[in-house]
Amino acid sequence: MSTSLSYRDAGVDIDAGDQLVENIKPFAKRTMRPEVLGDLGGFGALVEIGKKYKNPVLVSGTDGVGTKLKLAFDWDKHDTVGIDLVAMSVNDILVQGAEPLFFLDYFACGELDVPRATDVIKGIAQGCEESGCALIGGETAEMPGMYPVGEYDLAGFAVGVVEKENVITGRSIGAGDVVLGLASNGAHSNGYSLIRKIIERDNPDLDAEFDNGKTLREAVIAPTRLYVKPILAALEKFTIKGMAHITGGGITENVPRVLPENTVAQIDAKSWELPKLFQWLQKAGNVETQEMYRTFNCGIGMVVIVAAEDADAVQDLLGEQGETVYRLGLIRERQGDEHQTQVA
């Protein structure tokens, strides 16, 4: 007679999954908002739209962390990639003026390492807490044979809300408007295939002091900055005409996504200093300047476009919220079919 088999024999440990859920409940609980009905663990999560909204529009976004995860595996650093995951989605929906309401995550692996997964999801909860977004559920998929031992993949899903009349579309952007840039916290979650290639080729001392007491390793793995609370504070007092979250495609490919077709963002490359991480990447990788601008954020994580008469006040308010803000340039009329973001 054949030996009796269990799900664990096939590589799926239900007890480990249950332990992970218990581990993360306290972290998720700290993220809760009054709109959330019920607790973690149901088949679906319930969220009501508050009565303060007259004509609410839901804004959704989904993203991952990309190959930055390969460095997390190689360096056994798992406590901040969850922040990256949240930031990539909530910063995206923020661009349209949405206040993030809730977030769900997908964690997939070949073999569930509970302490490691706990670190990851603790980071997700931290990102949610910092952005005022409720972590209302997720999926942990243990799939033997699908991923190498010690590796996993992440996906995140965010939903926010904005009054219909306050949706930011970029349509009102015109010549003379001011382009502001909010400083990034590093490379955020984009360009890591190139970063890894540069590290592999240059073989630097990752643990030597690199910038303001940080090692190069710390600079490379630093989590994506969350812009939610400062931007929402600015939206309470000022009209923001357009925003661009600087992700894959860098500055030159993301800013045009919010511009009317007849406009160009003319950005002065001297308006901010290229952070040391990007200086090193450019030199070590012999990366051309325009390739830098279309691959990395180059120190600018969020672009905000406002009327000229509001620029000083918006810059001051964001500064009071803890952001480093640069006046990058102006919006001008487009000439022919020129690219809609010019950095020079």
From Swiss-Prot:
Pathway(s) per entry: Purine metabolism; IMP biosynthesis via de novo pathway; 5-amino-1-(5-phospho-D-ribosyl)imidazole from N(2)-formyl-N(1)-(5-phospho-D-ribosyl)glycinamide: step 2/2
Q: Which CDD domains match?
A: PurM
Question: One GO BP annotation here?
Answer: adenine biosynthetic process
Q: Which UniProt keywords apply?
A: ATP-binding, Cytoplasm, Ligase, Nucleotide-binding, Purine biosynthesis
Q: Which InterPro entries match?
A: PurM-like_C_dom, PurM-like_C_sf, PurM-like_N, PurM-like_N_sf, PurM_cligase
What family does the entry list?
A: Belongs to the AIR synthase family.
Q: What is this protein called?
A: Phosphoribosylformylglycinamidine cyclo-ligase
Organism, as annotated: Neisseria meningitidis serogroup C / serotype 2a (strain ATCC 700532 / DSM 15464 / FAM18)
